[in-house]
Amino acid sequence: MYYLKPIGVVEQNENYTVLNIFDEFVEGLDGLKEGDYIIVLVWFHKNDSEEKRKILKVHPRGDINNPLKGVFATRSPYRPNPIGKYTVKIHKIYRNKIFIDKIDAYNETPIIDIKIFSEKLDCPKI
């Protein structure tokens, strides 16, 4: 059995998305600063059902004019494990709140991890 423990939740406001980190994980933010790029992993909790996890082919971007593709070849939220990934810039950190660019996650979306972006590790050489 696998166990995921959210480290915080997403909060949307007019200008930014705010990552609200739970108090027990705030110490893990040490070393992050304004201007850093981070990778944020979230759990698409509103798309999480047994039926939706079985969907393995989708029309990209939900457009039926696009031919069906396997979910691993798309950015669809319908997946066997509904994990979302965003690479974003930190605009501000205040206590347990990280202010980032807007992302398409709902309020209260569980944050499952944050990683510092590393060009060496995260950008393949083509």
Swiss-Prot record:
Entry keyword S-adenosyl-L-methionine: yes
Keyword flag S-adenosyl-L-methionine: yes
Pfam families: TrmO_N
PANTHER family documented for this protein: TRNA (ADENINE(37)-N6)-METHYLTRANSFERASE
Segments forming domain TsaA-like: 4-126
Homology family: Belongs to the tRNA methyltransferase O family.
Protein name: Probable S-adenosyl-L-methionine-binding protein MJ1583
InterPro entries registered for this protein in UniProt: TrmO-like_N, UPF0066_cons_site, YaeB-like, YaeB-like_sf, YaeB_N_sf
Top-rank taxon, per record: Archaea
Positions with a binding annotation for S-adenosyl-L-methionine: H45, K46, R75, Y106, N107, E108, T109
Keyword entries, A-Z: S-adenosyl-L-methionine
